[in-house]
């Protein structure tokens, strides 16, 4: 029988309840269900994990050492599995060297293209560089001063891993005496042992000379020998001076600038051969930002103008002593506003007095005295401390005053001038990468016909690969991105779709792909392209499993699995599986309720008019925003929409949020480019709620994050038993000595390392997983220990603490945002992005509202089922009903249609975006023909109006 099915038996990972399921192979399958229902546990932690584990275990133990160890999922049996590839939203690289180009591997093809087809120019005069003869090389060397000592080198190995014994033995046999390896000189008579896994540069010393008359012949012979050894490359190493590289291939006759052989490595900013020497290929430096040190120049030093670690003003401090000395020298007092100080004085304050000394008066218990000392400046002081400290806390503290500044040598282009002087069609590799993907495709189409026959023959296949990958990126709605864009700045959805294009480009078949909500961050207009891409992946002969909540994706799937019926302990079952029709018919399926129309998110009957006040961003110019003025009505539910890359995040996260955070919350972040934000007097604080984890260690959990655990510990410390034993709230903390189990240090589990097998996590034998020692667990509140409370779900805890109003109120907010299934002690590292965001939202809801707060949320519906979106909308509407303002970046039409006010940016992404296309109520935006959001919103509003008219 053909193995055309994936059969899962007895899946019990996390909350799955002994699930049995049969899935068709080589089909497009959607797994859906409420947040926390067990979709990801089934798709990622069971199916993918077992497929990946089996593949890895088929490799040798040596190979497995480099691939990491994989846990075996809690499942009886899975048959019909293929090697599995996971494309989730959690693997965005924060490495500053990682870019869209490197992640998609397009940059590798570009390096190859520029090395083979690129035209080298002199970086000084721009002249096309031609071949260099031996005579020209000799002439360049003979310009050295009389008596200058130098040696002629033959670089036989450049930045290559290995012991290089083959080359060293060949040099010995040829009769050479010396060799230069990684900048150090060696005699070939001695034993030379090089580290195998480190890159080395090996240069044979062909001749050693001193500049004098009559050496032309010998020099020419030596250069020819070196060129013969290396295939056309030689170096003249001037003792005590710079190295002079020569090539028979490329050199400028006027300026004598030589380029070593054009190889793909030369175009890599991760390789010392091509990377800018000043910034080592990063393109930026982290420097202390003076705007973060002096954020408000209307203030004086005494009023706290200086906001820098170690330099806050305090009477009698060392900082005051320096400030008084600077004031005496540069003519200001501690009460002079910074803006009224001379430029010279501000520069001295920030960057020091160089060698000039200032007079300082110091008084202490031993008396007073006068000192004369130089002042290094606050900026220089912070940067020195940042370099020298071993304290992670200090690095983080000073790091908050720093921001990236463009490298002055390469101007952010990451490469050496000689590399940037190699062009195709008048553009160097960096220029090409800084264009948007749509412009790159146009550039290739315009310039391909202009290539010579030889260039076409050499670069034809390379250009085809580049075009294919760029077209894949365009097909998933990412044509506004540039290849130079840092991977760390991408959203989860963007990052996932980029890796998706890499997989399609590899054209594998017979693979199991598991994707996590690929429609995240994607405008409805581009969704059809994404679905077509997923079907293309299926048509290559792969099984595509997608964890998704998007209705269009579900309706396009070959097979749907609905996991539920509820979340957490109420989920973990297969409620329905089959076609869309099968799901709609299933009575227990909440997904079916929404797909069939039995339930729906209704459009509000009225839109709020707001309180008449506005926050106005003037002249927004960050990234692709085109000097726009944007008005945000206060006291309303505001939704910012637009095509991916249209400028939503630049406007809201970079400009509005950071400005409000600095002005209202005293944050150190630097806002994006604009002329200012008006209306700050109408709000008193801003709260940004994103999907970043609430903690990075297993010790962080919803109870500790929301602060409810402090109140719970206080309740336990007030019990009769605790008072008799003298236990305070600290006794009930699992993070400090005293009450916790010391065998596992309050973790409850022990990690046992198993070489070449997955690490085993076993419950602590002493506390049996309870986290606390026996004495602490003897204290009970209502017959429950502190450990029992941590194992309660939020739902159970609300009932348990009903007579503790302070605790009950905080827990109720967690319940209100749909997290009733989460346990109080659940590790923060196991929460999804959507769950983490809702914990943060609950934390803010629990605070007393002032009615003048601005809440900013970036795509809060990511990871949420339609029923969860329904509940989220109700929570956000409550915030606005209390007089607050909610501003949301969103693509989900069900949420957008419930907003009071929409600001639609566009019309396209990247350079074709950055304008306001439409604004107003959803009904007003739906009538704007140029708005893509309006086009998709209109039928939705009409359908709702029709149902309302029919009384449904």
Residue ranges and their predicted role:
Residues 1-952:
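Conserved phosphate-binding elements of NTP-dependent enzyme cores
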């Amino acid at each position: 029988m053909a193995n055309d099915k994936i059969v899962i038996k007895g899946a019990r990972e996390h909350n799955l309840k002994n699930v049995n399921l049969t899935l068709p192979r080589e089909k497009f399958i959607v797994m859906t269900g409420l947040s926390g229902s067990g979709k990801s546990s089934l798709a990622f932690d069971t199916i993918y994990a077992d497929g990946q584990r089996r593949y890895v275990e088929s490799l040798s133990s040596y190979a497995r050492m480099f691939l990491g160890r994989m846990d075996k999922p809690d499942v009886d049996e899975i048959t019909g599995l293929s090697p599995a590839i996971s494309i989730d939203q959690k693997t965005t690289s924060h490495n500053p060297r990682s870019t869209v180009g490197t992640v998609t591997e397009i940059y590798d093809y570009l390096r190859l293209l520029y090395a083979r087809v690129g035209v080298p120019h002199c970086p000084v005069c721009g002249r096309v560089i031609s071949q260099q003869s031996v005579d020209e090389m000799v002439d360049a060397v003979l310009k050295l001063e009389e008596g200058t000592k130098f040696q002629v080198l033959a670089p036989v190995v450049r930045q290559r891993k290995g012991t290089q014994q083959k080359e060293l033995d060949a040099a010995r046999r040829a009769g050479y005496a010396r060799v230069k390896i990684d900048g150090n000189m060696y005699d070939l008579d001695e034993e030379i042992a090089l580290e195998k896994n480190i890159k080395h540069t090996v240069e044979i010393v062909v001749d050693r000379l001193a500049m004098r008359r009559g050496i032309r012949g010998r020099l020419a012979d030596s250069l020819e020998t070196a060129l013969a050894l290396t295939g056309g490359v030689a170096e003249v190493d001037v003792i005590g001076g710079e190295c002079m590289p020569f090539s028979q291939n490329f050199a400028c006759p006027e300026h004598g600038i030589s380029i070593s052989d054009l190889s793909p490595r030369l175009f890599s900013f991760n390789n010392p051969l091509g990377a800018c020497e000043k910034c080592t290929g990063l393109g930026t430096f982290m420097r202390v930002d003076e705007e973060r040190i002096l954020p408000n120049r209307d203030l004086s030093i005494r009023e706290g103008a200086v906001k820098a670690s170690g330099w806050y003003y305090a009477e009698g401090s060392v900082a005051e002593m320096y400030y008084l000395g600077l004031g005496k020298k540069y003519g200001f007092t501690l009460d002079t506003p910074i803006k009224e100080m001379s430029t010279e004085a501000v520069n001295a304050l920030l960057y020091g007095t160089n060698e000039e000394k200032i007079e300082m008066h110091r008084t202490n218990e031993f008396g007073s005295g006068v000192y004369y000392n130089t002042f290094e400046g606050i900026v220089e002081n912070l940067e020195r401390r940042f370099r020298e400290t071993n304290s992670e806390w200090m690095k983080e503290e000073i790091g908050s005053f720093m921001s990236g500044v463009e490298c002055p040598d390469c101007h952010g282009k990451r490469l050496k001038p000689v590399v940037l002087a190699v062009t195709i069609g008048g553009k160097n590799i960096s220029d090409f990468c800084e264009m948007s993907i749509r412009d790159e495709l146009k550039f290739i189409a315009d310039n391909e016909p202009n290539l010579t026959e030889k260039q076409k023959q050499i670069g034809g296949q390379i250009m085809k690969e580049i075009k294919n990958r760029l077209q894949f990126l365009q097909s998933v709605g990412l044509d506004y991105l540039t290849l130079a864009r840092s991977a760390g700045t991408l959203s989860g959805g963007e990052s996932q779709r980029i890796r998706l294009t890499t997989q399609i480009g590899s054209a594998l078949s017979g693979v199991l792909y598991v994707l996590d909500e690929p429609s995240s961050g994607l405008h409805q207009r581009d969704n059809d392209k994404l679905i077509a891409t997923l079907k293309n992946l299926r048509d290559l002969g792969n099984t595509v499993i997608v964890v998704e909540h998007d209705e269009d994706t579900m309706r396009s799937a070959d097979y749907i699995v609905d996991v539920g019926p509820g979340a957490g302990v109420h989920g973990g079952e297969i409620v329905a599986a089959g076609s869309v029709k099968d799901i709609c018919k299933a009575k227990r399926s909440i997904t079916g309720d929404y797909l069939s129309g039995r339930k729906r998110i209704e459009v509000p009957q009225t839109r709020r008019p707001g309180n008449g006040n506005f926050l106005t961003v003037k002249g927004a110019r960050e990234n692709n925003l085109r000097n726009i003025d944007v008005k945000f009505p206060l006291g309303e539910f505001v939704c910012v929409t637009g095509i991916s890359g249209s400028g939503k995040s630049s406007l809201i996260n970079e400009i509005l949020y950071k400005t409000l955070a600095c002005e209202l919350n005293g944050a150190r972040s630097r806002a994006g480019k604009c002329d200012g934000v008006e209306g700050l007097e109408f709000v008193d604080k801003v709260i940004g709620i994103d999907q970043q984890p609430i903690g990075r260690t297993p010790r962080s959990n919803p109870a500790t994050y929301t602060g409810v655990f402090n109140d719970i510990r206080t309740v336990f410390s007030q019990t009769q038993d605790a008072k008799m034993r003298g236990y305070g709230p600290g006794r009930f903390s699992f993070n400090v000595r005293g009450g916790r189990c010391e065998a596992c240090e309050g973790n409850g589990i022990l990690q046992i390392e198993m070489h070449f097998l997955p690490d085993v996590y076993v419950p602590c034998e002493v506390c049996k997983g309870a986290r606390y020692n026996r004495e602490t667990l003897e204290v009970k509140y209502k017959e429950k220990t502190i450990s029992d409370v941590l194992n309660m779900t939020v739902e159970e805890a609300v009932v348990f603490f009903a007579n503790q109003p302070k605790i009950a109120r905080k827990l109720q907010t967690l319940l209100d945002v749909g997290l009733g299934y989460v346990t109080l002690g659940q590790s923060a590292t196991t929460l999804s992005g959507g769950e983490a965001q809702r914990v943060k939202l609950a934390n803010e809801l629990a605070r007393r509202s002032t009615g003048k707060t601005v809440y900013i949320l970036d795509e809060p519906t990511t990871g949420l089922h339609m029923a969860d979106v329904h509940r989220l909308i109700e929570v956000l509407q409550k915030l606005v009903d209390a007089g607050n303002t909610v501003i949301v970046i969103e693509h989900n039409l069900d949420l957008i249609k419930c907003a009071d006010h929409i600001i639609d940016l566009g019309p396209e992404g990247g350079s074709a975006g950055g304008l306001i296309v439409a604004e107003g109520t959803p009904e007003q935006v739906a009538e704007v023909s140029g708005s893509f959001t309006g086009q998709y919103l209109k039928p939705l509003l009409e359908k709702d109006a029709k149902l309302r008219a029919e009384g449904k």
